Structures are given as C-alpha cells and as structure tokens.
Amino acid sequence: MSILEKITSSPSECAEHLTNKDSCLSKKIQKELTSFLQKKETLGCDSESCVITHPAVKAYAQQKGLDLSKELETRFKAPGPRNNTGLLTNFNIDETLQRWAIKYTKFFNCPFSMMDFERVHYKFNQVDMVKVYKGEELQYVEGKVVKRPCNTFGCVLNTDFSTGTGKHWVAIFVDMRGDCWSIEYFNSAGNSPPGPVIRWMERVKQQLLKIHHTVKTLAVTNIRHQRSQTECGPYSLFYIRARLDNVSYAHFISARITDEDMYKFRTHLFRIA
C-alpha cells in the first residue's frame, strides 16, 4: 500500500471539507460564472481555480459584486508549488494548516515559527496547551479568530533564525487523544531536536501533566527519509496530516518514506492555479 493511501487527502483542488467535489465553487458562483466555466479552454484554463483567477473573470466578478477571494480561501486548497519542486514558503504552510483546521474541527493550527522563538515574538512560544485543549486559546479558522476545544496541535518550524531566509522545515504535533498523550518532533532529515525545541517540549509536557496522567515527548528522527534538497516542507505537512488521520508516529520510525511520495503529495496539498 502506498503511504498516500493511509491518509484521507486526494489530488482534487477542492477544499477537503466539501462533500461534493464535482465543483469547488458555491452554487451561486457557479451560476454567475456559467458562461466562463463552459468556455474555460478559451481562457487558457483547465481548472476552476484558473478560471476564477483569470483577469477577465475577476473584472466581471468585481462588476457583479462577487467575492471570488472568499471562494478561493474557503472552497479551494491553498496556492503553492503543486507540479514542481519549488520550496514551500511559510504562506504555503500556514494556509494549508488553516484549511485542515476546517476539516478537522479539533485541530489547532499554529502559525509557523523560526527557531529563535524563545526571544522573538511567535505564537508558537506563547501557546498554553491546556488552553488549547479547553478551548480557551485563539486560533484563525475560515477567515476569523475563534476559540474551540482542540485535542490535536500542529506547527511547522524552520531551523533558521528570523534574521535568515530559511533552512529546513520540521514538524511539531501534539496528540491529546487517547490514554497516553504525546508531544512529537519530526525531522525528515533524521536530525535530533535542537535545544529550543527540547525546552519547549518539556515545558508543554509539564503543562499537560496538570490535567492528564500520562504525557510523553517523542523525537521521531531515527530515519533519514529525505534525500532531496526540496521536500522538507511537504514532509513536515505530511507528518501532521498523517497524524491527524490516525497514522501512528511509529510508522515514521519503521520504514522510509521517499521523496517521490512527497512529489505526489504536493498534488494533494495545493490547488491547480
């Protein structure tokens, strides 16, 4: 079985919380843009996202008072390097996690962080995990700030400092489901967590031990999965997505997941245009 078959995502460009994937668009927008959608080839398009981002369609929508930006944000996957090996930006990552937080209603999507989070203002270092669990921590979902109880937490960190341009993406996942809770660090290159992450994990562990009897920290780093120079972002997102879909962390320490798997996973992450 392919590793991608273990998760619930698909190559459709529609946001995953939509049940009808025949069209990503709302019925109102479909109706208003029927003529454009029927002749999308003449626009040089092969997807709905291409159609609604086309200058002619955007101009028409503006005249009609149609909010296409909301359609893109809530009914399509995030933009990003779907069909190439371009490096993922923090926008690609955060916008993907925001969309997953719509599908997974008990998932807390934390904005990205650089590795100097202990001295620079990042949400990651300010989160109280007990408040996350109880629904007292603010998070951004569907274009608005909300509070809701969450039993999973995910964040993608960069190993560079905020003064740099970025080096390597890694993942943090906190699982507050079941009897034994876990605070997990995943690095596709197989490197151990650096000091700031170790301290963060231990601090969060002490927070959670106040409300739950068993909490462990895990470094999921015993296998060097990544061999390329480009796939750390997809690997980090894949770890979070797999864990949300109840794939055990043990899967990542028992067999290598290939770069080729991540090339395919990109088509699950991003919309076509």
UniProtKB/Swiss-Prot annotation:
Disulphide-bonded residues: none
Function comment: Cysteine protease that plays several role during infection including processing of the structural polyprotein or inhibition of the host immune response. Catalyzes the maturation of the pp220 and pp62 polyprotein precursors into core-shell proteins. Plays a role in the disruption of host pyroptosis via specific cleavage of gasdermin D/GSDMD. In addition, strongly decreases the host cGAS-STING signaling by targeting IKBKE via its enzymatic activity. Also impairs host FOXJ1-mediated antiviral effect via degradation of FOXJ1.
Catalytic activity, EC: 3.4.22.-
Induction field: Expressed in the late phase of the viral replicative cycle.
GO biological process, one term: viral protein processing
The protein's name in its UniProt record: SUMO-1 cysteine protease S273R
Molecular function as annotated in GO: cysteine-type endopeptidase activity
Source species: African swine fever virus (isolate Warthog/Namibia/Wart80/1980)
Protein location: Host cytoplasm; Virion
Residues at which substrate binds: 226
Lineage: Viruses, Varidnaviria, Bamfordvirae, Nucleocytoviricota, Pokkesviricetes
